[in-house]
A protein has these predicted regions:
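Polar, enzyme-active/binding microenvironments
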Residues: 1-273
């Protein structure tokens, strides 16, 4: 349930299940647990994370104030500077969804799909967690610019808990969760060219219809891990070659079944090729 981001040296997780404000980090080249980085502006669950080598941005979370109806949270977005440990600062964008997939280049971050958090924004919304509306829209932010976002395009399916992988030029969105909100799992993978706004194009299929899994990528390959399929949580790992279209291929298995978790890498699209 945490958001994940990373540069070429450290990986960072922010927020988490049952609502947490903590930000932790680990060094990719070393084994071991996390160390304290700082705190988010408020407790969050299921934020997206995008990053380049300088900055990580988190947004689109389920907030502590969301547990009481009607929803009144402000849709905060946070950012950190990887080189400077400390609390997150306000990025200045109001994000109306949670459980969105995310992709990015070194200059642009995109969040896609998700579940509407509160009324009064495009797609509606409901003060009941079980009945909130899944959405199709994709929104972009510029990593170096605070307080600005813009419509990017529309997925072919609505829903939260999809998984995103990207090179520096192309982003792929795979799967969809079937946890509440009237949506079943899908195996669809779609892609966009990150520099060009527009609707995504069909890429292929995952090996299994699922969502709420983790994902990570290099400049060449995207990997989807675990998640929730119609039978329950799974340990499946599959991968795609980002530059070419086609169905995902089996990679192996996680040590245990997992869902509602995130992945990051030290060679993703936000760091260039």
């Amino acid at each position: 349930g945490a958001g994940a981001a990373g540069n070429s040296t450290i990986g960072v997780s922010a927020g988490g299940y049952s609502l947490q404000s903590s930000i932790g980090y680990f060094v990719f080249s070393s084994s071991g647990g996390q160390s304290d980085f700082g705190d988010l502006q408020q407790k969050q669950w299921l934020p997206f994370g995008v990053s380049n080598n300088i900055r990580g941005v988190f947004g689109g979370a389920y907030y502590a104030t969301d547990y009481s109806a009607p929803f009144n949270a402000n849709g905060f977005s946070d950012f950190i500077q990887f080189a400077t440990k400390g609390d997150a600062s306000n990025f200045g964008v109001r994000v109306p969804t949670y459980a969105s997939a995310s992709i990015n280049s070194s200059t642009r971050g995109i969040y896609a799909g998700g579940v509407q958090r509160y009324p009064g924004t495009s797609g509606g919304g409901s003060p009941s967690y079980d009945n909130q509306d899944a959405v199709t829209y994709m929104r972009k932010i510029e990593m170096a610019t605070l307080g600005e976002e813009e419509h990017f395009g529309e997925l072919s399916f609505s829903g939260g808990y999809a998984m995103g992988v990207s090179s520096s030029t192309r982003g792929c969105i795979g799967g969809r969760g079937g946890n509440k909100h009237g949506s079943s799992q899908v195996n669809t993978i779609e892609f966009v060219t990150i520099a060009t706004q527009g609707n995504p194009t069909d890429f292929g299929d995952l090996t299994d219809a699922r969502g709420a899994g983790a994902s990570c990528s290099s400049s060449v390959r995207g990997v989807f891990m675990g998640g929730n399929n119609p039978s329950g949580s799974t340990n499946i790992i599959d991968f795609i070659t980002i530059a070419t279209t086609g169905n995902a291929t089996d990679f192996g298995d996680l040590l245990s079944v997992e869902k509602w978790f995130q992945g990051c890498s030290d060679v993703h699209g936000g760091l260039g090729d």
